[in-house]
Amino acid sequence: MMEESGIEATPPGTPPPSTAGSTAASATPVSLALSSPLATPSMSSPAYSPPLPAAVAPLPPPIMTSATPSFVPSAAVSTIAPPLAPAPAPVTSSAFSTSLPQFSAPPPLSSTSGSGLSVPPTGPPISGFSLSSTYDITRGHAGRAPQSPLMPSYSAPPVTGVLADPITQQAPFSSPLASGTGSGSSITFPEEHEDPRVSAAQSGAPTGGLWGFIKGVAENPMVKSVLDKTKHSVESMITTLDPGMVPYIKTGGELDIVVTSNKEVKVAAIRDAFQEVFGMAVVTGEAAQSNIAPQPVGYAAGLKGAQERIDSLRRTGVIHEKQPAVSVESFIEELLPDKWFDIGCLIIEDPVHGIHLEAFTQATPVPLQYVQQAKSLTPQDYNLRWSGLLVTVGEVIEKNLLNISRTDWHAVFTGMSRRQMIYSTAKALAGMYKQHLPPRTV
């Protein structure tokens, strides 16, 4: 029967196997044939040899002949011999010197699947076998049946669920081979290395997202300094384009000043000066009476008029007894013979800190004829003649010169407005006041 089928099951010089051995050989499947996912892992009859896949042909199949028994190549013998041995031994090949790991024989399978066997090759290979630069490692090696590089050579139970990327699963597949035989597989695969560009891109992102980035920037001292300078620049631009915005931007803080006048020329000048020195300040104006002549004459009269304005507001209860106040009073003085000058007196009084300071504006020359007219318009029996004149110099100039205001005639004679004069003196007064204040209140 064996000879008619053309298969030499026993090489020359070896005793014929017993019937029990044949039965065991037929019942024991070939482990190398099972390792290939393309071949059926069992044999239904000893009349056929285990075929090799058509896509992989590194091993010569047994010589098919109907003549007398002939010599079978050692590669075929060594391939078939391991399943017949009671204990598995390392499989060697005469065509390759690569060592293979040992595999334990799987349990016998049913023979009903033998109908799925592929047609054996039509003839033996013409030439020998050798490795070359174009040799595909997935086509099997070392004389054993080819197997998938990512599959073990034993039939594993079906895996349920979704399989992951085969590259990431190569460690679990290679572990049973190494642990079962004590040696790793000769088929190796390159490890998947992480792209450094992706890592750099991920590590460069802030841990806290957008808010974390904003928080980190806001806590930077240099950024804070830049923001402060930017805020000051914006405020300067706004106040330059619209000077009326200054009171709204710089109004606030702990400093509260009351000016003893409701005229904008005085209140605005003092507000700008104190906000320039202190940064922020609340400056308001209240109308007050000086209880002296409308046009004071001499320094003493000027000081008296400024102080009387503050006292009148305190007596009437318009301001608190401890409220800091600034008062402005203008007067004329004959500094040289027949040479008169208009001067402004500024006083700041702070009862809480016991501060009382005075300052004077620059002297603005007044033509002698205007002073003489003001004297002539003042009655001799005027009850406040001791402090000054009934008619101010500004009123006289307004009557004699067209398009000139009685409250701001200084710009015509000097080119500098009265507001500018009060501002410069008030700034000096605010600087002195700041120096006299305790450090904690500055």
UniProtKB/Swiss-Prot annotation:
Question: Which compartment or compartments is the protein found in?
Answer: Golgi apparatus; Cytoplasm
The answer to keyword Cell inner membrane applying to this record is no
Keywords on this record?
A: Cytoplasm, Golgi apparatus
Q: Which family does it belong to?
A: Belongs to the PRRC1 family.
- Give the main location: Golgi
Q: Extract one GO BP annotation from the record.
A: epithelial structure maintenance
Could you tell me the gene encoding this protein? PRRC1
Annotated spans, Disordered: 1-47, 87-134, 171-204
What does this gene product do?
Answer: May act as a regulator of the protein kinase A (PKA) during embryonic development.
Listed Polar residues bias regions: 171-188
- Mention one GO molecular function: protein kinase A regulatory subunit binding
Q: What is this protein called?
A: Protein PRRC1
Instruction: Note the Pfam families from the entry.
Output: NTPase_I-T
Which residues, if any, are the signal sequence?
A: none
List the GO cellular component terms. cytoplasm; Golgi apparatus
Q: Output compositional bias ranges, type Low complexity.
A: 19-47, 90-99, 110-120
Subunit info here reads: Interacts with PRKAR1A; resulting in PKA activation.
The protein's matches in Gene3D superfamilies, at most eight in alphabetical order, are given as:
3.90.950.10
Q: Does the keyword Signal apply?
A: no
